[in-house]
């Protein structure tokens, strides 16, 4: 499966401001988002399932891949394109056994060692970060910056996206590293005009 990682949106209901998630995701896709990850940490399994199912209706319509954060059971239940796992989540090899070879598995990494391990274990792509300070992740151990991103990117051969504090003022510097895409939350979801916010993060608009 050929995946376009150029503009990777991660959901977060805290930024909805009363708006419908389906509408927000649709506007983001119309603005240029190429892949969507459903990431909702503080909800019940049933609620997460309902949220993911709702988002998948939109991503299916626009033929955009949908990734589920951490929850393999939800990914299987809605037949998502794949999952994204952190360093403390289920091991990649076990996730691959459960999901099979045709599903996408992404791994969060913050240094070269983690990146090479994930690549060697068969990750389809990496989420590299945290690049810049951000308010949406509370357990950030280290900000790696553009230099750290470049070192990791240069050490691997699989696709990767950068994450952490990326916005319309700095995304071009991030893309200069040769990374396949940028992953954002508030840079799109915290804006009033979702479609425009997404479009402002495209290098070739």
UniProtKB/Swiss-Prot annotation:
Binds 1 Mg(2+) ion per subunit. Pathway: Cofactor biosynthesis; thiamine diphosphate biosynthesis; thiamine phosphate from 4-amino-2-methyl-5-diphosphomethylpyrimidine and 4-methyl-5-(2-phosphoethyl)-thiazole: step 1/1. It is an enzyme of class 2 (transferase). It catalyses: 2-[(2R,5Z)-2-carboxy-4-methylthiazol-5(2H)-ylidene]ethyl phosphate + 4-amino-2-methyl-5-(diphosphooxymethyl)pyrimidine + 2 H(+) = thiamine phosphate + CO2 + diphosphate; 2-(2-carboxy-4-methylthiazol-5-yl)ethyl phosphate + 4-amino-2-methyl-5-(diphosphooxymethyl)pyrimidine + 2 H(+) = thiamine phosphate + CO2 + diphosphate; 4-methyl-5-(2-phosphooxyethyl)-thiazole + 4-amino-2-methyl-5-(diphosphooxymethyl)pyrimidine + H(+) = thiamine phosphate + diphosphate. GO terms for cellular component: cytoplasm. One of its GO terms (molecular function) is magnesium ion binding. Keywords: Magnesium, Metal-binding, Thiamine biosynthesis, Transferase. Its cofactor is Mg(2+). 4-amino-2-methyl-5-(diphosphooxymethyl)pyrimidine binds at residues 37-41, 69, 108, 137. Gene3D superfamilies: Aldolase class I. Its EC number is 2.5.1.3. Mg(2+) binds at residues 70, 89. InterPro entries: Aldolase_TIM, ThiamineP_synth_sf, ThiamineP_synth_TenI, TMP_synthase. Signal peptide: none annotated. GO terms for biological process: thiamine biosynthetic process; thiamine diphosphate biosynthetic process. SUPFAM superfamilies: Thiamin phosphate synthase (SSF51391). CDD domains: TMP_TenI. 2-[(2R,5Z)-2-carboxy-4-methylthiazol-5(2H)-ylidene]ethyl phosphate binds at residues 134-136, 165, 185-186. It comes from the Bacteria. NCBIfam families: thiE. Belongs to the thiamine-phosphate synthase family. Condenses 4-methyl-5-(beta-hydroxyethyl)thiazole monophosphate (THZ-P) and 2-methyl-4-amino-5-hydroxymethyl pyrimidine pyrophosphate (HMP-PP) to form thiamine monophosphate (TMP). This is Thiamine-phosphate synthase. It comes from Clostridium botulinum (strain Okra / Type B1).
């Amino acid at each position: 499966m050929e995946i376009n990682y150029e503009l990777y949106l991660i959901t977060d209901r805290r930024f909805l401001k009363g708006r419908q998630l389906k509408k927000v995701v649709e506007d983001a896709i119309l603005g240029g988002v190429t892949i969507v990850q459903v990431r909702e940490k503080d909800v019940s399994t049933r609620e997460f399932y309902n949220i993911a199912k709702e988002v998948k209706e939109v991503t299916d319509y626009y033929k955009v891949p949908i990734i589920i954060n951490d929850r393999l059971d939800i990914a299987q239940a809605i037949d998502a394109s794949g999952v994204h796992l952190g360093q403390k989540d289920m091991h990649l090899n076990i996730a691959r056994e459960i999901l099979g070879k045709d599903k996408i598995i992404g791994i969060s990494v913050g240094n070269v060692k983690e990146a090479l391990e994930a690549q060697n274990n068969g990750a389809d792509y990496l989420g590299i970060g945290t690049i810049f300070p951000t308010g949406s992740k509370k357990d950030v151990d280290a900000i790696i910056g553009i230099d750290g991103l470049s070192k990791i990117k240069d050490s691997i051969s699989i696709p990767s996206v950068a994450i952490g504090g990326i916005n319309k003022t700095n995304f071009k510097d991030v893309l200069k590293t040769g990374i396949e895409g940028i992953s954002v939350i508030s840079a799109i979801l915290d804006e009033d005009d979702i479609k425009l916010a997404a479009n402002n993060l495209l290098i070739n608009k």
